Amino acid sequence: MSLGQRLALLASRLQEPQRVASFQRLCGVEVPLSSPAADEDAETEVRGAPGEPRRRGRQPGAEDSPAKADCCGAPNGVRNGLAAEPGPTGPRRAGSQRRNSLTGEEGELVKVSNLPLYYLFCLGTELGNELFYILFFPFWIWNLDPFVGRRLVIIWVLVMYLGQCTKDIIRWPRPASPPVIKLEVFYNSEYSMPSTHAMSGTAIPIAMFLLTYGRWQYPLIYGLILIPCWSSLVCLSRIYMGMHSILDVIAGFLYTILILIIFYPLVDLIDNFNQTYKYAPLIIIGLHLILGIFSFTLDTWSTSRGDTAEILGSGAGIACGSHAAYTLGLSLEPSLHMLPLAIPPLTVTLFGKAILRIVLGMLLVLFVRDIMKKITIPLACKLSSIPCHDIRQARQHMEVELPYRYITYGMVGFSITFLVPYVFSFIGIS
């Protein structure tokens, strides 16, 4: 057997849904014998195209696929609640009985016998969700180091955009259920290869280490511990949730390493261009919009298209906001002779200002997001002559979803790097 055949055989085995199900059982996740899902295991399965795993029902990425509903804490109108028999090992609704904001779909009833692992992997999967991003990047920009925060966003946008587009090109379905138990339905309508959670969970800690080591004074061992812990937690959480095969996660990890090798040397150049070039905002907005339109042509409707527009809008807004802040002198960064920076001692005053900035800043950001959401969807429907009485259906049109996500999160990003720092400077807490 040649090397190529061996690698193909290995990849085929790593893609098997039975391996995902085995990992779930090892971690204490099972379908209760009395649940409807257990009774359905014997139902007839639908066989896909050659080389694809067996699966039932709707295919991920299809037009009538459900939109997403997070596992542990995503926004977008999900609902929390307790399932019947909520004991430590009793049946519970996957994702704490979360309901999909666009279709009303809920996770299936499952039995979790290892709650510490359940909550640990919920934390891991949240490290790749909107709630985390909307807290993490502003915290860096407002409280820690805007220089690092801006560059983290550039890397995140590159990695996530390439990952989402690759999914829509390869079009591999999610692991078949059964045997896999879907603990999450938020991303169930998207394709599987590669895992963009694994990509962001690999890119962010590596980029944090590369950007901060030498700029800040801290032991090298901290970074060497952070990277494998963060990345492995996110990667394993996607297998635990039943969202990805082992192959998806490994491919996402390796794909991210390749992207960082190619693009990381350009990050300084991109950030300097965003801040200093006179016509940077026009180029940023136009380029990100073109990339968004291209991604929308790769496949029929799925929730990943809206995510891609959201990522591009956020990146464009943060870049334009950093340009405005630099132009008006709001970007106060230490000179090169002050490097490496010493980590200041944590005092009551420092902690209080940090909490005040994050609370006040997030209130302003969420206010901007809600206002823009209420404006952009009806306006996009009106301009496109699409009925807006059914928001779920309207958002399946590119003419509505792309401008809604792009403009709304573009303003969110602009607020993070310009409007909020301007308010901080005005009231004296910058």
From Swiss-Prot:
Site feature location: Stabilizes the active site histidine for nucleophilic attack: D248
Catalysed reactions, semicolon-separated: sphinganine 1-phosphate + H2O = sphinganine + phosphate; sphing-4-enine 1-phosphate + H2O = sphing-4-enine + phosphate
Active-site residue numbers: H197, H244
Region ranges (Disordered): 34-103
Chain positions covered by the region annotation Phosphatase sequence motif I: 167-175
CDD domains: PAP2_SPPase1 (cd03388)
Alphabetized UniProt keyword annotations: Cell membrane, Endoplasmic reticulum, Hydrolase, Lipid metabolism, Membrane, Phosphoprotein, Transmembrane, Transmembrane helix
Regulation: Inhibited by NaF, sodium orthovanadate, propanolol, and N-ethylmaleimide.
GO cellular component terms listed in the entry, alphabetical order: endoplasmic reticulum; endoplasmic reticulum membrane; membrane; plasma membrane
Known tissue expression: Highly expressed in liver and kidney. Expressed in epidermis, in the stratum granulosum and the stratum spinosum.
InterPro entries, per the entry: P_Acid_Pase_2/haloperoxi_sf, P_Acid_Pase_2/haloperoxidase
A molecular-function term among this protein's GO annotations: sphingosine-1-phosphate phosphatase activity
UniProt region (Phosphatase sequence motif III), positions on chain: 237-248
Phosphothreonine PTM positions: T103
pH dependence, entry free text: Optimum pH is 6-7.5.
Disulphide bonds in the chain: none
Record GO biological process: ER to Golgi ceramide transport; extrinsic apoptotic signaling pathway; intrinsic apoptotic signaling pathway; regulation of epidermis development; regulation of keratinocyte differentiation; sphinganine-1-phosphate metabolic process; sphingolipid metabolic process; sphingosine metabolic process
Knockout mutant characteristics: Mutants appear normal at birth, but during the first week of life they exhibit stunted growth and suffer desquamation, with most dying before weaning. Their subcorneal layers, including the stratum granulosum, stratum spinosum, and stratum basale, are significantly thicker, whereas the stratum corneum is thinner than in wild-type mic.
Bilayer topology annotation: Multi-pass membrane protein
UniProt enzyme class: hydrolase
Gene3D superfamilies to which the protein is assigned, alphabetical: Phosphatidic acid phosphatase type 2/haloperoxidase (1.20.144.10)
Superkingdom assignment: Eukaryota
Role: Specifically dephosphorylates sphingosine 1-phosphate (S1P), dihydro-S1P, and phyto-S1P. Does not act on ceramide 1-phosphate, lysophosphatidic acid or phosphatidic acid. Sphingosine-1-phosphate phosphatase activity is needed for efficient recycling of sphingosine into the sphingolipid synthesis pathway. Regulates the intracellular levels of the bioactive sphingolipid metabolite S1P that regulates diverse biological processes acting both as an extracellular receptor ligand or as an intracellular second messenger. Involved in efficient ceramide synthesis from exogenous sphingoid bases.
Family to which this protein belongs: Belongs to the type 2 lipid phosphate phosphatase family.
Protein name: Sphingosine-1-phosphate phosphatase 1
Organism name: Mus musculus
Protein's gene: Sgpp1
